[in-house]
């Protein structure tokens, strides 16, 4: 009997996964492809019941070894249909995942924040397998985090008691957990690179500025988004919160206690009544706000107080085509073109969109018609060729570019120039390459390019738009270059691409950038300078900023002083 028990103990010991001590207790992970993986480690108490719509609270210590061997809940999205696609969706979701090499000591850390418009997405959708094979194998540790989304993450009354930004506070708590515990996993707490894409990138931008987090990282990677945009500063979030509370029969102000008692089913029913998108250029119903706490000022002002640290900023050459021509992201943005709508896009179509979705609520007041004509002239009339074989393709492309500039290109360029003016070392790239399989046959050739989310195929092996064969060229070397770029930056603070002398941006008025094309890479200049100049001049002239309405007051006062 004694021999049998000893045998059982020895067998169990042989099958036990890697165990690491944290500040709250031990966690047991799994091994995969030469890496050690720890899944769904809690970094905060479940934000349920009395903790709903509150800042995250540190978890209670645990005595037994915590089984960090499988994913648990994704955070509740903003819309019931999205939640139904996830087998594991719920409020108890504040966990993070760590993927590390087996042998690790003082390794750099990539702290990944997923995108999804602050309303959908999860850490689990990225998996751990590719991170283990392509990142941990090259001597970096990856931490992927979850944060509250949609109404659970960003409900706000615009008061100190119900300020919103719960999702950003979750990210801050996760970052603090990693910084305090990563040394036990073989990581260097002084070499944490915060990294995100889309809303995850806007989050990274916000973390670099917030007094809660700006001293907790060493480098930042911001891909295809910026906090310098209205959809990341929530001009309508308080009004959206008020509408939701009223539909649910909760008092306003003072809705928090009533809202805490509402079930997810009741809230989803109310969202169905309210609608899950704004239908305007502000795009998101739920997003961060300028709360005077996490975000004490508008990002364009707050960045002046942020520390100077190496920053890598990237984008695609046709960001808006993801939402327009490809008709994707419909659960968060309402700008898509169906195959039936595509042939109808012309100057009149674009003009109607400008009036209804950009200049709604009489934006620009008595100058609204002039601004309307200025935008139409810049995006359609000035560039319209005298003779063109595919006029519809021209209009579809211009429609996509209008969305690209307002929601991505111009705010990203503004952030780049603001950081460079502060002497921050900023490396910039633009992704022009795309695999032809991501584009459907009905989409005009002129409107095609590298859309938003294109890098997901290469950085994470995630087939967002189509399955791409990464064994063929040029996709194989582009994938290698992008991953090497991220890893070298995390290790040294300088992104490195073989055979390319890539320097930080030196002139904010003529941004130099790495262009990643199908036929190679090269250093070029003048990144989206014309639309940047157009929107900056319009803001200065009118005292209102369509790119980020929360930033208008500052420029209105500047206008008055001139």
Swiss-Prot record:
GO terms, molecular function: carboxylesterase activity
Gene3D superfamilies xrefs: alpha/beta hydrolase
Record field: catalytic activity: a carboxylic ester + H2O = an alcohol + a carboxylate + H(+)
Entry-linked SUPFAM superfamilies: alpha/beta-Hydrolases (SSF53474)
Pfam families: COesterase (PF00135)
One Gene Ontology term from the biological process aspect of the record: cellular catabolic process
GO cellular component annotations of the record: endoplasmic reticulum lumen; peroxisome
Entry-linked PANTHER family: CARBOXYLESTERASE
Protein name (database record): Gut esterase 1
Gene designation per UniProt: ges-1
């Amino acid at each position: 009997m004694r021999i049998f028990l000893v045998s059982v103990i020895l067998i169990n010991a042989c099958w036990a996964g890697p165990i690491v001590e944290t500040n709250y207790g031990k966690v047991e992970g799994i091994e995969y492809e030469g890496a050690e993986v720890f899944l769904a480690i809690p970094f905060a108490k479940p934000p349920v019941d009395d903790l709903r719509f509150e800042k995250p609270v540190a978890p209670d210590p645990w005595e037994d070894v915590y089984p960090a061997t499988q994913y648990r809940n994704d955070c509740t999205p903003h819309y019931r249909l999205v939640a139904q696609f996830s087998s594991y969706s719920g409020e108890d979701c504040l966990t993070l995942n760590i993927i590390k090499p087996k042998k690790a000591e003082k390794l750099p850390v990539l702290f990944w924040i997923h995108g999804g418009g602050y309303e959908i997405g999860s850490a689990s959708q990225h998996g751990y397998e590719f991170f283990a094979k392509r990142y941990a194998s090259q001597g970096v540790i990856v931490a992927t985090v979850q944060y509250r989304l949609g109404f659970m993450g960003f409900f706000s009354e615009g008061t100190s008691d119900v300020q919103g930004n719960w999702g950003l506070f979750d990210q801050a708590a996760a970052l603090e957990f990693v910084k305090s515990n990563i040394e036990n996993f073989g990581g260097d707490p002084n070499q944490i690179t915060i990294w995100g894409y889309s809303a995850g990138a806007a989050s990274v931008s916000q973390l670099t500025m917030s007094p809660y987090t700006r001293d907790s990282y060493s480098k930042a990677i911001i891909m295809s988004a910026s906090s310098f945009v209205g959809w990341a500063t929530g001009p309508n979030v308080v009004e959206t919160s008020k509408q939701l509370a009223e539909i649910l029969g909760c008092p306003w102000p003072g809705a928090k206690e009533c809202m805490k008692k509402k079930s997810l089913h009741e809230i989803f029913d109310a969202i169905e009544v309210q609608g899950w998108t704004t239908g305007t250029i502000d795009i998101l119903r739920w997003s961060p706000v300028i709360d005077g706490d996490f975000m004490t000022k508008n990002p364009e002002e707050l960045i002046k107080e942020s520390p100077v640290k190496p920053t890598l900023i990237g984008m695609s050459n046709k960001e808006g085509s993801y939402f327009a021509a490809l008709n994707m992201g419909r659960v968060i943005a309402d700008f898509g073109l169906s195959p039936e709508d595509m042939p109808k896009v012309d100057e009149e179509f674009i003009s109607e969109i400008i009036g209804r979705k950009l200049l709604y609520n009489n934006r620009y007041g008595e100058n609204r018609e002039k601004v309307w004509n200025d935008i139409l002239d810049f995006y359609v009339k000035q560039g319209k060729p005298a003779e063109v074989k595919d006029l519809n393709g021209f209009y579809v492309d211009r429609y996509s570019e209008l969305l690209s500039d307002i929601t991505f290109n111009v705010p990203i360029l503004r952030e780049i120039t603001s950081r460079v003016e502060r002497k921050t070392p900023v490396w910039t790239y633009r992704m022009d390459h795309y695999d032809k399989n991501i584009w459907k046959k009905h989409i005009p050739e002129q409107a095609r390019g590298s859309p938003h989310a294109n890098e997901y195929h290469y950085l994470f092996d995630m087939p967002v738009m189509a399955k791409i064969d990464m064994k063929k060229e040029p996709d194989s070397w582009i994938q290698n270059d992008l991953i090497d770029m991220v890893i070298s930056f995390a290790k040294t603070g300088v992104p490195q691409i073989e055979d390319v002398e890539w320097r930080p941006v030196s002139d904010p008025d003529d941004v130099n950038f790495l262009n990643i094309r199908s036929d190679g890479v090269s250093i070029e200049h003048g990144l989206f300078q014309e639309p940047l100049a157009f929107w900056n001049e319009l803001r200065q002239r009118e005292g209102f900023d369509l790119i980020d309405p929360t930033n208008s007051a500052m420029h209105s006062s500047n206008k008055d002083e001139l």
